[in-house]
């Protein structure tokens, strides 16, 4: 399949894609605490800074990659790939651009498998309600415009799941907006959706979506954090606001994405080569992407790149006992393990907030490192510790992977289905959250190479070819259970492997009529895997960031899925922000996006040069802006 042509203005050798100016800084060293995707990204980004002369990456377990864990399993006739964490990465520009650039830089450009928008995994997504699968209204490419409209209207009037949606949308504008005093006050997703639409939409539709992303309870999750752009439209009416945004081609852009793009130096921009441009064009035709060996292939490649850099000391199974700092401009950060204590100019902490709270709460005098003659007297950062204690809630999920040799096992094709909280216990005694049809998202297209189609140097066309994780036909399913339903569970309450597989098979038989027995089964209990952004989350992050900056003289940086997004793309962006602005880079004073000097990043609409993003949680004080889509970001 040919990849669309690329505008000449973006080809290599033309005007640089972006000009950025870095502040002049002295040489420095950094400790990165946590070897998940955020920490690996931060360490990789730091290796590109000539001023950063030493990086130490601490990871408490024996492996790197965090929740991104894949397993290749031999089966009769070939192999299949099971995922225990994220199984695909969402394609959404400009955020996904950073992932592509990093993957290209570490040698994965020919390994990326894109799930195309025309595939069933992109087109067909289901919700189980009340006792069958309901396809969410989405246009089908093979059908004409009128047939698609007819099908979607039919679903809205016939399906009990969707019936409350149309009147809720049509009459939403008649609901009173928040009072002026309430605009700064957060609320739960359940409260917001019920108030603006109706409780059925919250219970049947939105709760299912939040089960799929957060395994969370919409009575607790923050509306402003997770549905902010939608909530901000209620003064004019949400449906009207959506129509006007579509009419004016206005989109929401995260300001942090603009800052990540703006940081890239001249050498990095020139690295935006033909391969990367072709990958981006292919990505624009896709909905998600992954790798032949699963998503773990990305952190594995990052770890290899860190080892090759010669600047990174990777310490797995590191027993960190304390992170401390004696206030003062010239006082370093100290990381104490059972083996030694090292001083650093900056520490980037990407571990869970509760784990960080424990490390900051330990006085260096009480640790067991052998260097007893050089103990550091440091006052405990009580304000930071108190703020961190409010970040204490994450859900636990049981992930069950199943493989069946029968390729025609499923009654439908698609990405999978989610289960809303309105499903009674009799239909969902396993506390199921959803089922992923893994086979459907395990194949797609990858970049195949280019060929000349004309006499000029730039006259060539890239092509793609089919690609797949699995080398054998069959059906691969992932069943997710637990989440907020298991908040009250004790460790002894969680199911073991045999019980989890039995529960998963029982659920599949009830929902899909599958009675066949899987030939391969794997399960993994992911304890405290998904941090919950509960009501007031944004305010807590803001206050925590201020406190950390003050207590640690802007030398401690916080990043990871406890703060600014739980997705892989969110974590990669936080790693990039932490390794640049978090350690002292200044937002560039001149920014140009693309060959047109009139097209500038969203952050340039604000007084960005005054933003001090060093230390704490490095994120722009303005979170989201609206821009017309024809503005290059």
Enumerate the language-model features and the residues they cover:
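Glycine-rich FAD pyrophosphate-binding loop
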Residues: 47-74
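N-terminal mitochondrial targeting presequence
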Residues: 1-28, 633
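Conserved flavin/dinucleotide-binding core of flavoenzymes
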Residues: 29, 72, 137-139, 414, ...
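Mid-domain catalytic core of redox enzymes
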Residues: 49, 292, 316-477, 622-633
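Active-site/ligand-binding neighborhood in enzyme catalytic cores
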Residues: 166, 170-321, 330
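Dinucleotide-binding Rossmann-like beta1-alpha1 core, especially the glycine-rich loop
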Residues: 76-179
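N-terminal Rossmann-like FAD-binding beta1-loop-alpha1 element of flavoenzymes
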Residues: 28-57
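Conserved Rossmann-like nucleotide-cofactor binding loop
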Residues: 38, 63, 354
């Amino acid at each position: 399949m040919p990849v669309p042509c690329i505008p000449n203005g973006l080809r290599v050798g033309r005007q640089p894609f972006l000009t950025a100016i870095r502040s002049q800084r002295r040489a420095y060293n950094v400790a990165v605490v946590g070897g998940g995707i955020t920490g690996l990204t931060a360490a990789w980004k730091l290796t590109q800074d000539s001023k950063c002369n030493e990086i130490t990456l601490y990871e408490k377990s024996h492996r790197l990659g965090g929740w991104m864990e894949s397993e290749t399993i031999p089966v009769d006739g070939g192999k299949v790939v099971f995922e225990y964490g994220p199984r695909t990465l969402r394609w959404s520009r400009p955020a996904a651009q950073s992932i592509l650039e990093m993957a290209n830089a570490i040698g994965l450009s020919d390994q990326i498998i894109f799930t195309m928008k025309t595939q069933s995994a992109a087109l067909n997504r289901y919700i189980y309600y009340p006792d069958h699968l309901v396809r969410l209204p989405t246009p089908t490419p093979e059908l004409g415009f009128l047939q698609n409209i007819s099908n979607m209207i039919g679903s809205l009037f016939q399906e009990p799941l969707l019936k409350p949606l149309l009147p809720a949308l049509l009459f939403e504008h008649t609901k009173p907006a928040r009072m002026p005093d309430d605009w700064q006050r957060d609320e739960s997703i359940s409260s917001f959706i019920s108030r603006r639409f109706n409780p059925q939409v919250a219970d049947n539709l939105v709760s299912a979506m939040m089960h799929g992303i957060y395994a969370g309870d919409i009575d607790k999750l923050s509306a402003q954090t997770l549905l902010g752009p939608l909530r901000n439209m209620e003064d004019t009416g949400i449906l009207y606001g959506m129509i006007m945004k579509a009419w004016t081609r206005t989109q929401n852009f995260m300001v942090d994405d603009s800052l990540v793009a703006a940081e890239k130096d001249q050498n990095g921009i020139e690295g935006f080569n033909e391969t990367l441009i072709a990958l981006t064009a292919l990505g624009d035709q896709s909905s998600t992407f992954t790798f032949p060996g699963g998503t773990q292939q990305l952190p594995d490649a990052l770890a290899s790149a860190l080892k090759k850099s010669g600047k990174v000391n990777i310490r797995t199974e590191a027993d960190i006992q304390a992170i401390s700092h004696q206030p003062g401009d010239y006082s370093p950060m100290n990381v104490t393990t059972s083996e030694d204590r090292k001083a650093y100019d900056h520490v980037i902490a990407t571990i869970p907030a509760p784990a960080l709270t424990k490390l900051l709460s330990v006085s260096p005098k009480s640790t067991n490192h052998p260097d007893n003659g050089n103990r550091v007297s440091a006052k405990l950062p009580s304000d930071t510790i108190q703020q961190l204690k409010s970040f204490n809630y994450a859900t636990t999920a049981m992930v069950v992977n199943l493989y069946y040799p029968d390729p025609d096992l499923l009654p439908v094709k698609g990405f999978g289905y989610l289960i809303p909280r309105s499903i009674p216990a009799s239909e969902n005694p396993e506390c199921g959250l959803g089922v992923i049809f893994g086979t459907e998202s395990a194949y797609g297209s990858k970049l195949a190479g280019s060929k000349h189609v004309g006499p000029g140097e730039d006259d060539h066309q890239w092509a793609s070819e089919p690609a797949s994780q699995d080398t054998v036909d069959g059906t691969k399913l992932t069943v997710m259970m637990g989440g907020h339903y298991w908040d009250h569970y004790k460790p002894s309450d969680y199911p073991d492997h045999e019980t989890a597989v039995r529960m998963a098979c029982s659920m599949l038989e009830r929902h899909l009529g599958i009675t066949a027995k899987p030939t391969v089964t794997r399960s993994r209990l992911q304890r405290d895997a998904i941090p919950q952004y509960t009501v007031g989350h944004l305010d807590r992050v803001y206050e925590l960031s201020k406190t950390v900056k003050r207590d640690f003289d802007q030398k401690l940086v916080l990043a990871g899925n406890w703060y600014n997004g739980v997705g892989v793309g969110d974590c990669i962006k936080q790693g990039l922000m932490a390794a640049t602005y978090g350690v002292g880079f200044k937002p560039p004073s001149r920014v140009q996006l693309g060959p047109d000097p009139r097209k500038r990043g969203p952050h340039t609409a604000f007084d960005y040069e005054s933003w001090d993003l060093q230390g704490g949680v490095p994120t722009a004080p303005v979170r989201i802006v609206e821009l017309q889509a024809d503005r290059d970001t």
